[in-house]
């Protein structure tokens, strides 16, 4: 009996070791949410696993409210780095909270600290033999009175693109593709992608809710679908394992 148990544990360990981990680091637009059956808010990495078969394991380490600075200072990056193994992937999407100039624990200058933090994630992932993928911040639903979607992220997406170019990192330009998504829905229907409820309309909220940054489950699934579609399009041999494991 003991031999049987030991053999079972060995097989389980070997099977898990053969799986490829995808670590997701970022902010609330990516993060898992509590009580997902009731909570309308979802991060896009929270709904990413169903797009892949069992050879890929999504490990979502994104946390609400984090910037590159606070993610590092709270040792969250260290906890990911210490677990990385050769062939793993690291999806990196920050920016929303790096913009918080009124908060010294989170704010980063896009051209200096933000850029250097992204480069740190890239270099240290590669040190462990893992494959980093940079993603620009998802767009906010920010239509003006003329129905024009107005950008809100300043130079953060630009610095992400430049870092990806300089260090030959696969890039998914989520800002651009989610702009197209918002525009395809239009000023009114795009509310479905986010959190818009009247008081009493949803049991999770007892007051009116109008949140144009965070995603509904519908919005999260749309964004996760964009990520997968763009991974398929990218011409990079390091992504073949991901592509072969897509459903």
Residue ranges and their predicted role:
Residues 17-62, 78-88:
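Serine-esterase "nucleophile elbow" of acetyl-processing enzymes
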Residues 1-19:
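Bacterial Sec-dependent N-terminal signal peptides
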Residues 75-221, 225-246:
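Alpha-helical cap/lid subdomain in secreted, periplasmic
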Residues 29, 46, 65-68, 90, ...:
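Short, flexible micro-motifs
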Residues 31-41, 62-71, 100-110:
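Acidic/histidine-rich helix-loop elements
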Residues 31, 53, 72, 214-216:
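Generic, ordered loop/turn and secondary-structure boundary motif
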Residues 18, 39-42, 64-66, 167-172, ...:
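Short, exposed beta-strand "edge-strand" segments with a Pro/Gly-rich flavor and a Y/T-containing core
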Residues 8, 32, 55, 68-70, ...:
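A broad, structure-centric signal for solvent-exposed, well-ordered loop/edge residues
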């Amino acid at each position: 009996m003991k031999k049987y148990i030991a053999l079972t544990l060995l097989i389980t360990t070997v099977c898990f070791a053969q799986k490829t981990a995808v670590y997701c680091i970022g902010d609330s637009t990516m993060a898992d949410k509590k009580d997902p059956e009731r909570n309308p808010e979802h991060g896009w990495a929270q709904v990413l696993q169903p797009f892949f078969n069992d050879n890929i394991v999504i490990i979502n380490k994104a946390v609400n409210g984090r910037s590159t600075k606070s993610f590092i200072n709270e040792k969250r990056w260290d906890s990911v780095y210490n677990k990385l193994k050769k062939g793993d992937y690291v999806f990196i999407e920050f920016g929303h909270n790096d913009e918080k100039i009124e908060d010294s624990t989170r704010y980063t200058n896009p051209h200096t600290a933000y850029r250097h933090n992204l480069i740190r994630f890239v270099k240290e992932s590669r040190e462990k033999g893992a494959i980093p993928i940079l993603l620009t911040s998802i767009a906010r639903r920010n239509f003006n009175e003329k129905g024009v979607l107005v950008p809100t992220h300043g130079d953060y997406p630009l610095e992400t693109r430049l870092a990806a170019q300089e260090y030959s990192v696969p890039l998914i330009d989520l800002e651009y593709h989610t702009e197209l998504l918002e525009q395809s829905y239009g000023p009114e229907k795009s509310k479905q992608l986010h959190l818009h409820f009247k008081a009493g309309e949803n049991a999770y909220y007892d007051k009116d809710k109008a949140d144009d940054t965070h995603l509904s489950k519908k919005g999260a699934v749309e964004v996760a679908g964009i990520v997968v579609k763009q991974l398929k399009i990218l011409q990079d041999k390091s992504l073949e394992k991901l592509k072969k494991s897509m459903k």
